[in-house]
């Protein structure tokens, strides 16, 4: 077991040089204190789950102290934001402190968000607020517990440093972990600035360290892009199956690894709404829940354009054409499992689509529907769920088709219940739960955010005494407006 002040660094990205990032030291926040830490994320670095030395956490991740081997850098990239190209973005408030190697030989980026101004701050103050830092922390740890690939969050550090957004708030930092922080926007930056040598250098770096199995391919960069498409198809399928809405799918927020990245005004669906918009700045609904699939394809096409100096256009198009069928296959498999169905059948896609159509416009809680569906026999579960639907006759027709489908597969109810409970969470990160934890933390009480994180780390298990975290949102929490302000 390692200690926090004795980590092994190997800063590979920093060695790419000044064309890729700029050396910047963290700007400390005042009176830093540990808000919450993740035992699961600590384990990735071979660190003990217990955060006994909270002062050391606060010093290191509040910007007051650095490891001797750390090389903090602000990365440069660009990207398409709401469909329009922004030629120069970069880490405006975050620093890649370095890369740590764990005992398994895995490299983990240590990225400190809220570390102060950088050359890419674009008139910003370089700070993150406690509110957004808690939201990113909770999501970064909740999604992996659901089986959704994501960057991770080691801890949040609070402070007395004031910052101004819509109102006066307090600054915080978040320590994010990921195998890489390279985004689609990194490739776009070097493509659109015609720095094709650096573009090739970046592609070679990513391929060597993160897509090593492509080395043996006849055309390694083409093989790498195909894998990026495959990973994103599976990622978006998991988002859609579990009702996760990202909110800001700009290309600079898309990880080259196909993991969920850069959390902002995200949301899990409460009542099912295919057209749900979780970002109140998204007036046109570009990043609505139902648009996440075509937008992911659009973003992959933007990445493909940036790779045209390295890969033949026909090969890029062929890989792009795989996205939708791959997504559909992953999504249907996930939804089949959520319905407790173990064997594929011809009409499964129609069964899923009909269910979602019946949910639309009804007061049906998306997550709890599947959990309740597995609690009892299909007949009893369907009867208890019926009243949540507006068109009960249409639901009855779906229910009969589903009941027959379950009957055809056979098996006993207890096996079905266990199978469904293993994939249908009892606890999901609802916005109102996050908001309650944030409001308590803003008053200096971190009990709620720590408890919520603990509950969400085991979303499929019934946890005695935690029933309040399963409840649907109260009226005030049903339509919380979340902005990009952070």
UniProtKB/Swiss-Prot annotation:
For this protein, the Enzyme Commission number is: 2.7.7.-, 2.7.7.108
Question: Superkingdom of the source?
Answer: Bacteria
Active-site residues are 252 (proton acceptor)
| Pfam families xrefs | SelO
Q: Which UniProt keywords apply?
A: ATP-binding, Magnesium, Manganese, Metal-binding, Nucleotide-binding, Nucleotidyltransferase, Transferase
Name the family.
Answer: Belongs to the SELO family.
User: What is known about what this protein does?
Assistant: Nucleotidyltransferase involved in the post-translational modification of proteins. It can catalyze the addition of adenosine monophosphate (AMP) or uridine monophosphate (UMP) to a protein, resulting in modifications known as AMPylation and UMPylation.
Q: What is this protein called?
A: Protein nucleotidyltransferase YdiU
The organism encoding this protein is Pseudomonas aeruginosa (strain UCBPP-PA14)
The gene name reads ydiU
């Amino acid at each position: 077991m390692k200690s926090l002040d004795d980590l092994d660094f190997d800063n590979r990205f920093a060695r790419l040089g000044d064309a890729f990032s700029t050396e910047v030291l963290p700007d400390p926040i005042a009176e830093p204190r540990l808000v919450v830490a993740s035992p699961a994320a600590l384990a990735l670095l071979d660190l003990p789950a217990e955060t006994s030395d909270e002062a050391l956490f606060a010093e290191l991740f509040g910007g007051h102290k650095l490891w001797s081997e750390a090389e903090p850098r602000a990365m440069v990239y660009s990207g398409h934001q709401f469909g329009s190209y922004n030629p120069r973005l970069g880490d405006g408030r975050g620093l890649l402190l370095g890369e740590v190697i764990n005992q398994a030989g895995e490299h983990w980026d240590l990225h400190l968000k809220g570390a102060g101004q950088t050359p890419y701050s674009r008139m910003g103050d370089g700070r993150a607020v406690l509110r957004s830092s808690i939201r990113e922390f909770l999501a970064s740890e909740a999604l992996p517990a659901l089986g959704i690939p994501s960057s991770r969050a080691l801890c949040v550090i609070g402070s007395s440093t004031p910052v101004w957004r819509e109102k006066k708030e307090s600054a915080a930092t978040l320590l994010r972990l990921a195998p890489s922080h390279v985004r689609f926007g990194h490739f776009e930056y070097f493509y659109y600035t015609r720095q094709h040598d650096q573009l090739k250098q970046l592609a070679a770096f990513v391929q060597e360290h993160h897509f090593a199995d492509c080395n043996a391919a006849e055309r390694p960069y083409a093989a790498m892009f195909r894998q990026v498409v495959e990973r994103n198809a599976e990622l978006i399928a998991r988002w859609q199956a579990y009702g996760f809405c990202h909110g800001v799918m700009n290309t600079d927020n898309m990880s080259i690894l196909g993991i969920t990245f850069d959390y902002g005004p995200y949301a899990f669906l409460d009542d099912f709404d295919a057209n749900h918009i979780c970002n109140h700045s998204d007036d046109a609904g570009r990043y609505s829940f139902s648009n996440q699939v075509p937008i992911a394809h659009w973003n992959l096409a933007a990445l493909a354009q940036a790779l045209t100096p390295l890969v033949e256009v026909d090969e890029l198009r062929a890989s792009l054409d795989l996205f939708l069928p791959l997504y559909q296959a992953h999504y249907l498999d996930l939804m089949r499992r959520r319905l407790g169905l173990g064997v594929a059948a011809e009409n499964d896609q129609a069964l899923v689509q009909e269910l979602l159509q019946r949910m639309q416009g009804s007061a049906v809680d998306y997550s709890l529907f599947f959990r309740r569906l597995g609690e009892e026999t299909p007949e009893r579960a369907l009867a208890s769920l019926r009243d949540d639907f507006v068109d009960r006759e249409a639901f009855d027709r779906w229910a009969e088709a589903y009941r027959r489908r379950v009957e055809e597969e056979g098996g006993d109810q207890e096996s079905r219940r266990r199978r469904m409970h293993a994939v249908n969470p009892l606890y999901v990160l609802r916005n109102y739960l996050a908001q309650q934890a944030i409001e308590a933390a803003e008053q200096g009480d971190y009990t709620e955010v720590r408890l919520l994180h603990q509950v969400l780390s085991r979303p499929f298990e019934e946890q005695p005494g935690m029933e309040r975290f399963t409840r649907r949102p109260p009226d005030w929490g049903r339509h919380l407006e979340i902005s990009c302000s952070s």
